[in-house]
Amino acid sequence: MRTHYCSAVNELSLDKQITVCGWVHNRRDHGGVIFLDIRDRSGLLQVVYEPENKEIFAIAEKLRSEFVVRVTGIVRKRPEGMINDKMETGRVEVIGTQLEILNQSPTPPFLPDDHQIINEDLRYKYRYIDLRRAVMQKKLTLRHKLNSCIRNYLNEQNFLDIETPMLTKATPEGARDYLVPSRVHPGQFYALPQSPQLFKQLLMMSGFDKYYQIVRCFRDEDLRADRQPEFTQLDIEMAFINEEDILQLIEGLLKIVFKEILNITLPDKLPRMSYKEAMTRYGSDKPDLRNPLELIDIADLVKDCDFNVFASAANDNSGRVVALKLPNGCDLSRKDLDNYGQFVTIYGAKGLAYIKVNDLSAGMAGLQSPILKFLSETAVHSILNRVEAQTGDVIFFGADKAHVVNESMGALRNKLGHDRNLINSGWQLLWVVDWPMFELDPQSNKLQPMHHPFTSPQELSAEALRSKPTQTLAKAYDIVINGYEIGGGSIRIHQPELQKTVFDLIGIDEQEAHEKFGFLLDALQYGAPPHGGIALGIDRLAMLLTDSTSIRDVIAFPKTQTASCPLTSAPSPAGNAQLTELGIRLAPTITTK
C-alpha cells in the first residue's frame, strides 16, 4: 500500500515516485495550490497538489484534518525560501499525482498538535487521538527501544524469559490485591499478582538459575504521579549468586540502556550509600543527589536549651533535631516562610523554625528569628558553625520523632531544591544498601519487613535474628535515579527455618504461614539454592528517560488518579446475571455510579 514512511523521503528520493499513507496533519490553500502535511508515526511530509489535474485536485479540496489518505507523487527539491530545516523532510516535497481518501474524520475534539495545551481528561478520553501527537509517538517508541535493549542484554547474559501466572493466590506484599472471583470454585478468589516474587523464587528451586520477565503487576493502592493500579516491571532472579553479582548485572544493564537510548556514558561502578547515611543526610531512602542541600544533626547542641521543642526531641531516644541551610535564602518573605511551614505539616511536622542570617559579622544582632529568645548565644553560634552559615543564608529546623523529621525535612529539602533552582542538570544514580531488616509500625508497634518477608538478613542465624531484630541489616538494595526509586531487590531466604523465624517475628504464626505460604515452605525443604533478584520499574525508567513528569505519559492507555479509564469507562458495573453466576451479591451499602 505504501513504499515509504514519511520521514524516509529525502534528497536521495529526488525525481522518484513514492507512495505514503497517513493522516492529514495540515491543509493549506495558497493561490490555487493545495499544500498538505501528511503525518505518520515517523514524522511529516509536505505534498503539493496543483490545479492542472482537476480530478485529483477536487479530491484534495475535500480533505480536512485527520482524514486518512494514500498519496502518490514525485519527489522534488523545495523551492528556495521554502526550505524548513525544523522538519526532517524539510528540504523536499512531493508533487502529488494520485490521492485516495482511505477514511474521513469529523472535526476532532482536539488536534494532535504538540503546541496545544489539552485538558488531561480529554486527552485520556480520546487517547487514540492524543497518541497521534509526535511527542507521544516518540515516548512510546523510546519505551519500545528500552524493552528491546533490556531483552537483548539479558539474552546475551544467558537469562531465560519465563512467564509466570496472572491468576494466583493472594499473599501479603504491602498493598491490597485485585481479586478475581472464581466461577468454578464459588466463594473463592484468585488475586492478580503484585509481583511474580514467589514464582521466580520457585523457578530458582526448579533449576532455572537465570530468569527474567517484563511483566504486568497489579496493586490496589492510592495513586500518585508515579503510580498506576497496573504497571510493568523488569523482574530478574538468579541462583548461586551474591549481592555483588546482582549489582554488577544491573550496572551493566543501565550502562547499555543510557548509552543506546541517550548516548550517555555511565561509570562502570555506581556509588553506594547505606540506608542509614541516606536518611541521616537527606531524610530520604531515595535521595536526589543533584540537590546540594543536606540535613545536619544538631541534637547534641540543643539538649540543654530552653526551647522545649528542640530539647524534648534532642533528649528522646526516638527523636531527632536537624538543621537545613538554604544558601542566600534571606530574600524569602514572611509569606514564603509561612508557606514552607504549612508545607511541612503535610508530613506530620507541627511547624517550621528558622533563623535568618542577615549579617553574620554582627553576631546575635545580625540574626532574625522568633526562636532566638529561647536559645543561648553559645548554642546559636555552635549551630551557625556546624552548618557553616554565611551572611544571607536561612537555616530551617526540624525537631520531632525521627521518622517525622526525616519525612518532613526530606520533603522540604526537595521542595527548596526545586523552588530555588538548586537542582543540577544531568544524571545521579546510586545504590542504597544495608537496609534494616524490619521497622516498627508506629500504630501497632509490631515488626514489619522493610522490603518483604522473603528478604535474607545479613546474619544467617535465626537466633541472632530473634535476639536483635530491629538492629539486623538485610541483604537488600535499591537503585535510585535522580531521586526516584527505579528498582529494588534482595538476596532471598533459602533456609526453611530462617523463613519460619521471619514469619513468626512479623506476626504470621505457623498455621497462617502454612495457609498462605505452605507451597514455598515445602519447596525450601527440597534443596533450595542461594538466590536473589531485583525488579526495575519500566514505567518510571521510561518516564525519566523521556523527561516526562508522570508515568501516564509513557503508558499507552493509562488510568487516571482515580484508577479509572475515561476511554473505556472502566471500571463498570457487572450485570446481575454475571454476579449470580459468580455467586456474588453486592452489599446494600455499595452503590455504583
Curated annotation (Swiss-Prot):
Reactions this protein catalyses: tRNA(Asx) + L-aspartate + ATP = L-aspartyl-tRNA(Asx) + AMP + diphosphate
Upper lineage: Bacteria, Pseudomonadati, Pseudomonadota, Gammaproteobacteria, Legionellales
Name of this protein: Aspartate--tRNA(Asp/Asn) ligase
Gene Ontology terms for molecular function: aspartate-tRNA ligase activity; aspartate-tRNA(Asn) ligase activity; ATP binding; nucleic acid binding
The keyword ATP-binding is assigned to this record: yes
Annotated region (Aspartate), positions in chain: 197-200
Source organism: Legionella pneumophila subsp. pneumophila (strain Philadelphia 1 / ATCC 33152 / DSM 7513)
Superkingdom to which the source organism belongs: Bacteria
A Pfam family annotated for this UniProt entry: GAD
